[in-house]
Each structure stands twice: as C-alpha cells, then as structure tokens.
C-alpha cells in the first residue's frame, strides 16, 4: 500500500499562517512537531503575545520567571522577519533588565504595536523605545519614562494608552502633540494633573484620574469622550476660574457623538461663570451618560439642561444621582425650571434611565422636563436609593402625575 497523503504538510502557506495566528505563541511553537515543513513556520509570525501562561506553572515564582525570560529570549533569537506586534503581560519584576534587551531588538525590527502590562512598581522605559518610529499603537502600564531630547514624537502613532505612568505633565503634552495621526487616547490613574490636549485627528478620549484641569485645545474630530474625574473633598481650588468649564472643555468638539462622565465630572463642568446659551450645538451627540450628579447643586443640574437642550439628535440619556449631600439647596435656585426650558423640544430622545433617585425637587423637575419635551420618548426607567417604602411610593405617585408629550412614553420603576 502506498503512503497516505500528508495533508498537513501540503497545506497552502496562507492557511498555515491563518492557523498559526489563531494559536497562542506556546501552541504555535508546538506545531514544529507536526512535520519537517512546519518546524520553523512559527518563526515568521509577526504578532508575538507573551504572558505567564507561556511556560509551565510552578509554585516557585522564581522558576516560572526564569523560564519565561528564557522562552521570550529564545523566541526572539529564532524569529525571522519583521515583528509588528509585541505584547508582554507579567507581574514579575526580575525580568525587567531583559525587557531592555528585548526592546532594543524590537526597535530594529519595525515594531508597530507595543504593549507592556507590567506589575506594581514602575519600569523605567529605555531610550531605545523612542527609536521605534514606526509605532502605530503604544500601551504602557506601570512604567516610568522620560524621552530623550532628540525625540520629536511618533509620526505614525494612532493609539496611545498610558495606565499608572510616572511622567512629567509637560512630557505627556509633548508626546500627544508629537503624534499628529493620534486617534485614540487613554490616560488613567494620573494624579494632580493639569492637562492640555492638542491632537487634530483624535476621535476617542478616555481619562481617569485626579485632574486639576483639562484643556481640549485642538480636538475637532472627537466623537467619544469618557472622563472619570476625582477631586479632593475641598473643591475650593477648582472654584477660582471665571471661565465656564462646560464651554472650555466641550466648546471645540462639534462632532461629538457620545459623552460619558463619572464621579466629579459634572461638578467640574459646572464650575465658572455660566454665559447663558452654549456657543455650540451638538448635532451629532446621540448618547449622554453622567454618573453621580448632585441634584442638590443647581449648577450641576444646569449642566444637564445645557447639554440636553443643545443636543437636538440626542437619543439616549443615562443619569445617576449622587448619594452624597454636600450642601443644602439654595432657595433662589428653585426657579431653574421656571425659565424658558419648557419651550425647548428634545425631538429625538427615546430612552432615559435615572438611577439612585431620592425624590428631591430637582430630580423630579428634571424628569418632568424630559417627559414634557420629548415627543418620541419611549421609556423612562427610574430606580430609587430610598429605603423608606412610603417615601418611595410618594415619589412614584408624583412622577405618574406628570404629563407626557409622547403617546408611547412609559415610566418604569425598578427596585435598587
């Protein structure tokens, strides 16, 4: 009998490459035993992803770390051709001197995507990283870096993600402005940072940290913004500016489609002298999510009103009330909804979700406003933070009394 055909060895190169790219690097290397033709097929992979699962588990972390270093070094030594992506996720610290050598190797191999997710403690990024001028994506976690003076930026970088990075504020700003093609920017766990962002092609912005101030100086193409902003309990330092933060932060983003804000973000937007109407109508804005809004603060409620009334195509609104009570409501603030807001129409609003409602005046008035100005509204979902059943029932009865301009509008009450 003749030998059966060796289908594995005779697979087209494109199919072999497709198979290898779907495997972990460890399993890809194991394909070397399939046949002599497969022995070094893995060595031309352009995307290399490493983590602690690349080596056999052991109760001795030192053994695992040593094996991981040897594994990565061996892969790089045997690799042939360009490396487009290199990703390392590890909590080990002793391998950090080896990372310097790996980055030097990568800087000479046309690396385009670099991801370093390291454990606690800052890893000082070597200068050779800034020689990786073909980078299109850079993600660093628990690192420290200070670019050399000759560094002018990454001309091709489109995505920048920095998580818990030790770096001077001016370095961040210089890095961002030195990436003219940047489309995605994420900065998280930054403390006491005054940040100016100039990125003419930026489309997606995610910020998480204790920012003192944020300036969007040149971001005309932004379509999505998400900000988690933390402040000290004493916010007097943030009350000094006469510029209205809502205008300062959102005054130059005409293409905005989605806005999400957490913690003190609405408070931050409310600071400064309100100019009246906003200078910009957000015709593309379809989703607004603002969490932990203090409905006892008339200025924060005004931010909500300003945003929804200047977003004619808004479809979805999510708001959570702040569980804290920072100060009593001033009586003169009660005329907020007696202005001309009920002359507005929200022609596209379909879905509203209010969470952690406690039934205070401004919460109820805001819901009444939405019901009375949204002709295509379908659902208003309300969940309450009240523990007293009678108080909760009073709130429900009050809300059911409000007129609705949409014949399809439904009020749904959920138990927290």
Swiss-Prot record:
The answer on whether this UniProt entry bears the keyword Repeat reads yes
Q: Where is the FBD domain?
A: 346-384
What UniProt keywords apply to this chain's record, in alphabetical order? Answer: Leucine-rich repeat, Repeat
Look up the signal peptide feature and give its range. Answer: none
Keyword Amino-acid biosynthesis among record annotations: no
Q: Where is the F-box domain?
A: 5-53
Protein known as: F-box/FBD/LRR-repeat protein At1g13570
Q: Which organism is it from?
A: Arabidopsis thaliana (Mouse-ear cress)
Q: What is the lineage of its organism?
A: Eukaryota, Viridiplantae, Streptophyta, Embryophyta, Tracheophyta
């Amino acid at each position: 009998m003749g030998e059966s055909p060796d289908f594995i060895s005779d697979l087209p190169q494109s199919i072999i490459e497709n198979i290898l790219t779907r495997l972990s690097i460890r399993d890809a290397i194991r394909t070397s035993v399939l046949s002599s033709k497969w022995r070094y097929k893995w060595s031309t992979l352009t995307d290399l992803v490493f983590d602690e699962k690349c080596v056999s588990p052991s109760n001795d972390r030192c053994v695992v770390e040593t094996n991981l270093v040897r594994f990565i070094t061996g892969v790089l030594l045997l690799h042939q051709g360009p490396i487009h992506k290199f990703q390392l996720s590890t909590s080990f610290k002793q391998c950090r001197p080896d990372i310097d050598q790996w980055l030097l190797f990568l800087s000479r191999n046309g690396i385009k995507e670099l991801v370093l997710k390291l454990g606690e403690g800052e890893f000082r990024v070597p200068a050779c990283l800034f020689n990786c001028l073909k980078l299109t994506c850079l993600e660093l976690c628990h690192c420290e870096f200070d670019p050399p003076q000759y560094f002018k930026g990454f001309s091709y970088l489109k995505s920048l993600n920095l998580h818990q990075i030790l770096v001077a504020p001016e370095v961040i700003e210089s890095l961002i402005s030195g990436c003219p093609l940047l489309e995605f920017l994420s900065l998280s766990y930054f403390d006491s940072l005054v940040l100016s962002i100039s990125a003419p092609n930026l489309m997606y912005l995610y910020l998480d940290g204790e920012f003192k101030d944020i300036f969007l100086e040149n971001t005309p193409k932004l379509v999505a913004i998400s900000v988690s902003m933390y402040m000290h309990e004493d916010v007097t330092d943030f009350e000094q500016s006469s510029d209205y933060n809502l205008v300062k932060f959102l005054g130059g983003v005409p293409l905005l489609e989605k806005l999400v804000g957490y913690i003190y973000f609405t408070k931050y937007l409310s600071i400064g002298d309100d100019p009246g109407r906003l200078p910009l109508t957000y015709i593309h804005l379809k989703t607004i999510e603002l969490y932990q809004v203090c409905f006892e603060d008339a200025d924060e409620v005004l931010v909500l009103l300003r945003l929804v009334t200047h977003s004619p195509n808004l479809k979805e609104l999510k708001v959570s009330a702040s569980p804290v009570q920072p100060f009593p409501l001033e009586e003169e603030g009660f005329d907020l909804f007696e202005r001309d807001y009920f002359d507005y129409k929200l022609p596209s609003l379909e879905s509203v979700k209010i969470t952690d409602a406690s039934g205070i005046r401004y919460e109820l008035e805001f819901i009444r406003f939405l019901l009375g100005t949204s002709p295509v509204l379908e659902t208003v979902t309300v969940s309450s933070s009240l523990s007293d059943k009678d108080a909760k029932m009073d709130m429900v009865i009050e809300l059911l009394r409000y007129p609705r301009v949409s014949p399809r509008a439904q009020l749904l009450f959920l138990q927290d």
